[in-house]
Amino acid sequence: MRALICESYGPIAQLRVREVVTPAPGPGEVRIRVESAAVNFPDALIVQGLYQVKPALPFSPGAELAGVVEAVGEGVRHLQVGQRVISFCGHGAFAEQAVVNARQVVPMPEGMDMDTGAALLLTYGTSLHALKDVGCLRAGETLLVLGAAGGVGLAAIEIAKQMGARVIAAASSEDKLRLCREVGAHETIHYTTEDLRQRVDALTDGQGVQMVCDPVGGDYTEPALRATAWRGRYLVVGFAAGAIPKVPLNLALLKERAILGVFWGDAVRRDPAAHLANLQQLAAWFAEGRIRPVISERVGLDGARDAIQRMAARQVQGKVVVHPHA
């Protein structure tokens, strides 16, 4: 089978598509024919050795997929050969076949296509966990989303609207802000031409926002934290800007602000029941037409490396989906 392979930690450019042996599932595992796999920012980090998890070399990147079960390992009871499934696998999705721990695989909701299934899990799962489980977003509150045209940001906009919140989307270009408005943002901030804190003050009558969802980090973290209201919550979701920011902790003290970390991947492992409940909620919203992943591009396996590079350079809006068999 063909797979995009990382043979040593380093630049994304060294990734190559190789012919490799088709793996067999072990006990508690399933092998999936990958029909669609989505590109996410952690893919860029993991191949450079910069992510929290470092797979044994060589490996294929790709954290989420949709496909069809082709083989079932010993002890697997809830999945059958031929079943359409989705999986948050962590790595291994950019390949024609993937062997995955069966506990990380769930049946695909009725009416969902492969591309949507692949694009839903990580970004929407992260955003729902962040806003509901960690941040406890309430109806009527105002949420500021940084990096709002990325996968997590767009998902956060849609989910926050379903939760009854007002959404302010911040992004770095007018094209990105236009997309944010299309998916439901109430207000937008062009944070390369506007002062983030001043604009938030103007949009909230000087009160600040109750919550910030930040998958970006970098230079906008401190002004966004300063723009939170009394007892506001700041969700640390990721560091797409590259730099991990350092902020004065007196900012937390002054308005009793809470700085909350969001590690969805580990939360899935620690509380699978909560993860399943969130997936069921996402599936229901999708079936009702309330959420819809923005898929900006589809590429074959030979285009996956370039897609990861563009993701790292923050040149992607929404999600890029890889079709390994194209």
What is each of the regions a protein language model found here?
Residues R84, T142, R166, G232-R233, ...:
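Short glycine-centered segments of the SAM/dcSAM-binding site in methyltransferase folds
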Residues A93-E96, A171-L179, I244-L249:
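Short, glycine/polar-rich helix-capping loops at beta-to-alpha or helix-loop-helix junctions
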Residues A283, E288-E297, R305-A326:
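C-terminal capping/lid region of NAD(P)-dependent oxidoreductase domains
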Residues D219-I291, H323-A326:
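Glycine-rich phosphate-binding loop and adjacent beta-alpha segment
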Residues R33, L45, R84-G147, E182:
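NAD(P)H dinucleotide-binding glycine-rich loop of Rossmann-like/cofactor-binding domains
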Residues V21-A38, L50-G92:
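Glycine-rich beta-strand-centered segment in the early N-terminal region that forms part
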Residues D195-G206:
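Short amphipathic alpha-helix with an adjacent loop that forms part of the alpha/beta core around
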Residues Q80, A118-E194:
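Mid-domain Rossmann-like dinucleotide-binding core that forms the NAD(H)/NADP(H) cofactor-binding site
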